[in-house]
Amino acid sequence: MQGVYPAIVTPFKDGKVDYDGLRTNIDYLIENGVSGVIPVGTTGESPTLTPLEHEKVIEKVVEFVDGRVEVIAGTGSNSTSEALEFSQYAEDVGVDGVLLITPYYNKPSQEGLKRHFGEIANSINVPIVLYNVPSRTALNIEPETIKYLFEEYSNITAIKEANPNLSQVSEVLDSCNIDVLSGNDELTLPIISLGGKGVVSVVANIAPKEFVQMVDFANAGKFDKAKEIHYKLFPLMKLMFIETNPIPIKTAMNMLGMPSGELRLPLCEMAESNKLKLQNALNNLGLLK
């Protein structure tokens, strides 16, 4: 995996998934050069989708993309059997890979992680992208575990690394050849400079062209040009996490007239003071017309 993979929102309208809006957003991203899309992850509000909605969104994204870019579907769970069912369904409807978050809340040991990911890897054929995000799961996939999984299972090929500890990224890249994608927009360039391949991005939902240019420059070793774009987008990167993701990105998309719609409880609308900060940043970037 290499390039920019937006973690796409799930647009809602009147309490239901807005599939027309989903198609519009996907077409926009593809037209602006992304390498793939990642539905039903954290940004896609997967925790508040019903299992049937989760599966239908995956199916519809595969249909809308129609082979133009990769579809890497979020199929993780803190239940191995549920993650396995979602992953098998995603494979059956034609995804190019699955994204598996570290089990959250129940906090398995590193041995438990090996068995969790291993059981799923043995049951599907499509590539697996591990997703390490300790800030949400309260659990870190240790570098030794990542190395073991990459070497033991041929279809575990990449990791979305959202641990901000660059020492961990260095250990992983020094120990094995797994593809590392930044799971944090702000750390995209540092991770690529260490040998990473790209980013699973939130900001790319609204600035895909700029993000693709930045990552392309970085992967070509043109870091001076990449840094110019990084610092241009940096205020927006920071604001995407001024409140819990995906509250800021959905708010920004609504401001820009892009299909996004409401949030599902327990997530709720952004504070007015933060909306103003976001609006100012969008104005400064020339995104608001």
Curated annotation (Swiss-Prot):
The record marks 42, 105 as: Part of a proton relay during catalysis. GO terms for molecular function: 2-dehydro-3-deoxy-phosphogluconate aldolase activity; 4-hydroxy-tetrahydrodipicolinate synthase activity. The active site is at residues 131, 160. Pathway: Amino-acid biosynthesis; L-lysine biosynthesis via DAP pathway; (S)-tetrahydrodipicolinate from L-aspartate: step 3/4. Pyruvate binds at residues 43, 200. It catalyses: L-aspartate 4-semialdehyde + pyruvate = (2S,4S)-4-hydroxy-2,3,4,5-tetrahydrodipicolinate + H2O + H(+). It is found in: Cytoplasm. One of its GO terms (biological process) is diaminopimelate biosynthetic process. Its EC number is 4.3.3.7. Gene3D superfamilies: Aldolase class I. Its main location: cytoplasm. Keywords: Amino-acid biosynthesis, Cytoplasm, Diaminopimelate biosynthesis, Lyase, Lysine biosynthesis, Schiff base. GO terms for cellular component: cytoplasm. Catalyzes the condensation of (S)-aspartate-beta-semialdehyde [(S)-ASA] and pyruvate to 4-hydroxy-tetrahydrodipicolinate (HTPA). NCBIfam families: dapA (TIGR00674). Belongs to the DapA family. Homotetramer; dimer of dimers. This is 4-hydroxy-tetrahydrodipicolinate synthase. It comes from Methanococcus maripaludis (strain C6 / ATCC BAA-1332). The gene is dapA.
